[in-house]
Amino acid sequence: MKTGIGLPVFPGVSIGPAVVYRKSERCVPVSSGDPAAEQAKFNEAVAAAREQLGALYEKAKIELGEEKAAIVEVQMLMLDDLDYLEGVAAAIEGGAAAADAALDTGEEFAAVFAAMDDEYMNARSADIRDMSHRIY
């Protein structure tokens, strides 16, 4: 039997099979060809992700406690990581669509964390992937 931890859609007790939502594979984004427009798209997506994570953090804090909600807080901090933001900006300047730039840069960072010899840091690779997928 597998055990999982997550946030319920509705409070209470449920009986039945659990469903784990997995985001579908990436759509093929098309760059507008204008790096400034792509950067603006990215900035808007980051702002939306920040709002989503803020709401999720507040819900998790109430339902799971501050310690477990800290995972969401870590993702909110990642949205401000200069290395990540500069990596995305460089990819956009190189002609990438905002979505590709965000996802590819996130994957590069996640791979670095996944390769570390520390279990805690390995787990952060999933947080990085979740954060970059939340943006797009």
Where are these regions (language model features)?
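Non-catalytic, soluble scaffold/interaction modules
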Residues: M1-Y136
